[in-house]
Regions:
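Conserved hydrophobic packing residues within short motifs/helices of P-loop NTPase cores
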Residues: 3, 35-37, 89
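Conserved redox-active cysteine motifs that mediate thiol-disulfide chemistry
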Residues: 5-22
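Short, internal strand/loop/helix patches
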Residues: 50-85
């Protein structure tokens, strides 16, 4: 599983989304599942977030995380995570293959990591 935490107001998040969309298509047969978790504010869902998703992630699995108390759950996701976004977690059945990236991930980093897990 590839979990990407992002928001529409985060420029690096928006910049890396095309890489994930490309990866989602390129690694479809490898049975990777991509999930995009938006940390946008609830007040922006209908005016900004939903239109953005329809335009940029129309075929992707996107979740709107409405809990703005990030400090209450960030450590539960990954103790290494300081809370910055974008943040990407690559989860494998083999814990030794799990990866965490805080900050923008390049196409090479993402694809090289996925290639090692195929």
């Amino acid at each position: 599983y590839i979990l990407n935490f992002w928001a529409t107001w985060c420029a690096p998040c928006v910049a890396e989304l095309p890489t994930f969309v490309k990866g989602e298509k390129q690694y479809k047969d490898a049975k990777f599942r991509f999930f995009f978790v938006s940390l946008d504010f609830k007040k922006d869902y209908s005016s900004k977030v939903i239109p953005f998703i329809k335009k940029h992630l129309p075929e992707s699995s996107v979740y709107l995380l409405g809990d703005s108390n990030y400090n209450s759950w960030i450590n539960l996701v990954n103790p290494e995570w300081q809370g910055a976004i974008p943040a990407t977690f690559i989860v494998s059945a083999d814990p030794s293959k799990c990866k965490f990236f805080e900050g923008e991930i390049s196409e090479k980093q993402l694809f090289d990591t996925l290639d090692t897990l195929k």
